[in-house]
UniProtKB/Swiss-Prot annotation:
Species per Swiss-Prot/TrEMBL record: Streptococcus sanguinis (strain SK36)
Entry protein name: Large ribosomal subunit protein uL15
Biased composition (Gly residues): 23-35, 42-51
A GO molecular function held by the record: rRNA binding
Keyword rRNA-binding among record annotations: yes
Subunit-structure text: Part of the 50S ribosomal subunit.
InterPro entries: Ribosomal_uL15 (IPR030878), Ribosomal_uL15/eL18 (IPR021131), Ribosomal_uL15/eL18_sf (IPR036227), Ribosomal_uL15_bac-type (IPR005749), Ribosomal_uL15_CS (IPR001196)
Length: 146
């Protein structure tokens, strides 16, 4: 085998389709755009959601709800995730981010009661569910709303 004899693997390199190069090429004359009309012209085409003048779907459907600009979205942490910390540790939002349990604090961190807590911890967060608060205090830990 010589350097000039090297060939790419079969089917690994697709040949570019050259349009408008004669009718016998299969893509001549209209270049795969069909006959005349808006879509055959250069820069032609209809805008997104246009249905030929018929009332588009997004206008036929009723409006629903609104977006509250003052909404608060909390980063959620479950009790079983808190078992990653050592017994007697203080768990704060900064510690949770450093440990990789939470990506971003958002409007604060909310602790939920899914799973089982096996360690005594001091947990500081923006919100707690009742079950989470009870589980933390039952293990001898403490809860602090910040």
């Amino acid at each position: 085998m010589k350097l000039h004899e090297l060939q790419p693997a079969a089917g690994s390199r697709k040949v570019r389709n050259r349009v408008g190069r004669g009718t016998s090429s299969g893509n001549g004359k209209t270049s795969g755009r069909g006959q005349k009309g808006q879509k055959a012209r250069s820069g032609g085409g209809v805008r997104l959601g246009f249905e030929g003048g018929q009332t588009p779907l997004f206008r036929r459907l009723p409006k629903r709800g609104f977006l509250n600009i003052n909404r608060k979205e909390y980063a959620i942490v479950n009790l079983d995730q808190l078992n990653a910390f050592e017994d007697g540790a203080e768990v704060t939002p900064v510690v949770l981010i450093e440990a990789g349990i939470v990506k971003a604090e958002k409007s604060g961190i909310k602790i939920l009661g899914n799973g089982e807590l096996t360690k005594k911890l001091t947990v500081k967060a923006a919100k707690f569910s009742k079950s989470a608060e009870e589980a933390i205090t039952a293990k001898g830990g403490s809860v602090e709303v910040i």
